[in-house]
């Protein structure tokens, strides 16, 4: 301990910076020199659970947050699952961090008082929406409402996560996104009572979008206009009960998607993709179809998880339209189909010139999970092993022993 205390204050603060806030604060009892040293640490995390005594922590934050020495707070993270916290206190703390030019702000708040009385939602201060220093903002929890004022300016915000929050009206999210000129990473987990019917995401600068969609949510439609996007994750986007507009994304390199209908419109938007993960749940009559002329000339890695046994038509099209494919991983997770109208694809190619180009030129890894020894599956596996001239590894397994990566 004497050796550590002999270090200069600047180095001690750097060491404290790497520790959890609770441990950082506990160093204040070591000696008079250490008593206020923790106030120079620019990164703070407070975690309160419903089974803990919250009032001492509230008083501690209120008293000491304004005493912090750094001119810039690098990160303020508050995680609170409690009925004793007052939204006014959290709002005050946010105002204080904003006055210290906070760069990362994470508020995870759930008021557990809804179990026995109406919840008072946390309405964050207007100054949050004009914070010029903010680079990362994450708002998480059913007890937070996003009420965006008319004056918005977040010129440095690059990462935004909105998880299970409510919006004051239909325009709040659209207005917020409109004034984030350098936003690169956006995650939206919706709540079924979030007050948004048509979710509009128009962000020219966006590079990554994660938008899980649950069928239980009330929604009329989605509009996604993100021309610079490189990574797209949208499970459950294509459902029959809402409309959507998804514009072309010429820079997409990786996509992780669930498909329930309208494969064609989806594929038209992501033809530049290099790595594609698809969870497919299609009716028999929709099982294959996207029009000729859609090619995945850059696709190298395909993960295909199909929750139907009528998987072959879609797969043969993807093989034919992906000439550079190197890795093919398939999971078939569904009951056998006994529909007489369904016709399986023939995997017997008499003319080698009609064999998909990726098999002859590039495929190196092949994995098939959910194998049940049906004739079509045997024909398909034999077809791959026969024609994949550059295959380096292959795996055929039952579903129970396979994890798709």
From Swiss-Prot:
Organism of provenance: Arabidopsis thaliana
Residue intervals passing through the bilayer: none
InterPro entries tied to this protein: F-box-like_dom_sf, F-box_AtFBL13-like, F-box_dom, FBD, FBL13/AtMIF1-like, LRR_dom_sf, LRR_FXL15/At3g58940/PEG3-like
FBD domain span: 347-398
Protein name: FBD-associated F-box protein At2g26860
SUPFAM superfamilies in the record: F-box domain, RNI-like
The F-box domain, residue ranges: 1-47
Domain of life (superkingdom): Eukaryota
PROSITE patterns documented for this protein: FBOX (PS50181)
CDD domains recorded: F-box_AtFBL13-like (cd22160)
PANTHER family: F-BOX/RNI SUPERFAMILY PROTEIN-RELATED (PTHR31900), FBD DOMAIN-CONTAINING PROTEIN (PTHR31900:SF28)
């Amino acid at each position: 301990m004497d050796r550590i205390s002999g270090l200069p204050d600047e180095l001690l603060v750097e060491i404290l910076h790497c520790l959890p806030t609770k441990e950082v604060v506990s160093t204040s009892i070591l000696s008079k020199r250490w008593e206020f040293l923790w106030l120079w640490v620019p990164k703070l995390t407070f975690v309160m659970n419903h089974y803990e005594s919250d009032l001492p922590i509230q008083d501690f934050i209120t008293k000491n947050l304004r005493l912090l020495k750094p001119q810039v707070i690098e990160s303020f993270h508050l995680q609170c699952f409690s009925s004793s916290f007052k939204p006014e206190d959290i709002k005050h703390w946010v105002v204080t961090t904003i006055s210290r030019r906070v760069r990362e702000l994470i508020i995870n708040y759930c008021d557990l008082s809804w179990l026995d009385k109406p919840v008072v939602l946390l309405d964050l201060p207007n100054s949050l929406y004009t914070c010029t220093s903010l680079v990362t903002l994450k708002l998480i929890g059913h007890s937070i409402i996003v009420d965006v004022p008319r004056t918005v300016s977040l010129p440095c915000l690059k990462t935004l996560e909105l998880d299970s929050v409510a919006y004051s009206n239909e325009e709040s999210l659209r207005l917020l996104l409109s004034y984030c000129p350098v936003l690169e990473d956006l995650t939206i987990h919706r709540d079924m009572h979030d007050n948004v019917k048509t979710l509009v995401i128009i962000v020219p600068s966006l590079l990554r979008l994660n938008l899980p969609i649950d069928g239980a949510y009330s929604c009329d439609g989605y509009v996604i206009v993100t021309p610079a996007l490189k990574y797209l994750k949208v499970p459950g986007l294509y459902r029959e009960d809402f409309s959507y507009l998804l514009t072309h994304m010429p820079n997409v390199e990786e996509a992780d998607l669930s498909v329930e209908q309208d494969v064609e419109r989806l594929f038209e938007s992501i033809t530049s993709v290099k790595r594609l993960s698809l969870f497919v749940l299609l009716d028999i009559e929709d099982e294959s179809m996207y029009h000729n002329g859609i090619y995945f000339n850059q696709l190298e890695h395909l993960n295909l998880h199909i929750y139907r046994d009528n998987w072959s038509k879609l797969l043969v099209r993807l093989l034919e339209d992906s000439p550079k494919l190197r890795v093919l991983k398939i999971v078939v997770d569904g009951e056998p189909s006994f529909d007489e109208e369904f016709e399986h694809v023939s995997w017997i190619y008499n003319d080698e010139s009609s064999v998909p180009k990726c098999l002859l030129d590039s495929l190196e890894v092949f994995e098939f999970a959910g194998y049940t020894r049906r004739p079509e599956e045997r024909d398909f596996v034999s077809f791959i092993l026969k024609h994949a001239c550059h295959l380096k590894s292959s795996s055929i397994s039952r579903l129970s022993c396979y994890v798709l990566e």
